[in-house]
Every structure is written in structure tokens, then in C-alpha cells.
């Protein structure tokens, strides 16, 4: 087994614990947990699961998981050890600009990471939930500045998810925004 998709269903902490103990899990290249609500999970459970797959994982999809910022903070150290990671998506979750900055800093060493899909920062939405494109542009510029400070070229997509359906996802801008910075010698 090199790809595993468990999507849009209810899992318990016990289910994820058992999954992390499977013998073949260390060979996993793709893990898709999109739509699995993680709000009530201990951050340690996901951390342990990612530890098991860190050496081989190439694709990680945590879309629409309701992952909390404390859970995300908990997995950042192990996420930065996923040296083979190429694609990572957190679309459909609510993330602040502060946690997105931490995420960018922790993943900057992942040289294979080429496709990054993140939600528009929660600060780009009005109190009523409407996406404010002007504010999003300002936050995008701030993210570009952060990536330039980190010194590694990368491409990132920001998305809004007006509803849980993948087909209604809109990316801003329609192309990824690129950071063309180079590490100094």
C-alpha cells in the first residue's frame, strides 16, 4: 500500500492510533484525510501518525478537516521532517495569518515541496464570512515578503471554499503566486 485515502467519514482517535501502528504505514507515499473532522482529536495522535510516514510521504491532504491551530502547531515539527513531501493541502480549514507564517517557516526546508494549497487567511474575511479581495491581496503580499525572507523559491495557491464541495473552490489568484527568491551563497 503506498496511497491511502480515508475521506469524508467519522474517525475516532482509536482509529488513527491503530492506523499509525499498521506495519505497512511506514511505506506510505500519499495520505488523504480530507473531510475527516479532527476538531476533537488530540494533536498528539496526528503527530504520531505523521512520524510514522515522515520518511516516505509525498502527498498530504488535510482539506476540510476542521484542523485547529493548536493541532497544526503540534504537527509542524514532524511536518518539517517529511523530506519527500511534494504536495500539501490544508484548503477548507480556518487558519490565521500567524499560523500560516509558522507553517511557511517550518516547511521552507522541504525542497521537494512544489504544490502548496492553503486557505485564504481568516483575516481576509469580513465578520460575516465574505472574502475581501483587497485584504487578501495585502495578506498575499505579506506572505510573499515572508517567503522572500526565507530565501527559497516556491509557489503557493490560496483558496476560498464557499461550500464543502471541491467543485466550488476558487483560487486567488487563479495561478499560484510565486516567490522568486534565491538563497545566498
What are the residue ranges of the model-derived segments?
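Leucine-rich repeat
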Residues: 17-26, 46-55, 76-83, 103-109, ...
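Eukaryotic tandem repeat interaction scaffolds
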Residues: 22-71
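Short, solvent-exposed loop/turn at the beta-strand->alpha-helix junction
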Residues: 10-17, 37-44, 66-73, 94-99, ...
Amino acid at each position: 500500500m503506498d496511497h491511502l485515502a480515508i475521506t469524508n467519514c467519522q474517525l475516532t482517535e482509536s482509529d488513527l492510533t491503530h492506523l499509525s501502528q499498521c506495519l505497512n504505514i511506514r511505506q506510505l507515499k500519499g495520505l488523504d484525510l480530507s473531510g475527516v473532522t479532527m476538531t476533537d482529536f488530540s494533536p498528539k495522535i496526528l503527530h504520531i501518525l505523521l512520524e510514522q510516514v515522515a520518511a516516505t510521504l509525498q502527498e498530504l491532504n488535510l482539506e476540510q478537516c476542521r484542523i485547529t491551530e493548536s493541532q497544526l502547531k503540534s504537527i509542524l515539527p514532524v511536518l518539517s521532517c517529511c523530506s519527500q513531501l511534494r504536495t500539501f493541502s490544508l484548503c477548507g480549514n480556518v487558519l490565521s495569518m500567524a499560523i500560516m507564517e509558522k507553517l511557511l517557516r517550518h516547511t521552507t526546508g522541504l525542497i521537494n515541496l512544489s504544490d502548496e494549497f492553503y486557505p485564504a487567511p481568516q483575516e481576509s474575511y469580513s465578520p460575516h464570512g465574505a472574502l475581501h479581495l483587497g485584504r487578501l491581496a495585502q495578506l498575499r503580499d505579506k506572505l510573499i515578503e515572508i517567503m522572500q525572507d526565507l530565501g527559497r523559491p516556491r509557489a503557493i495557491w490560496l483558496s476560498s471554499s464557499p461550500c464543502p464541495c471541491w467543485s466550488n473552490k476558487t483560487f486567488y489568484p487563479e495561478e499560484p503566486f510565486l516567490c522568486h527568491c534565491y538563497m545566498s551563497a
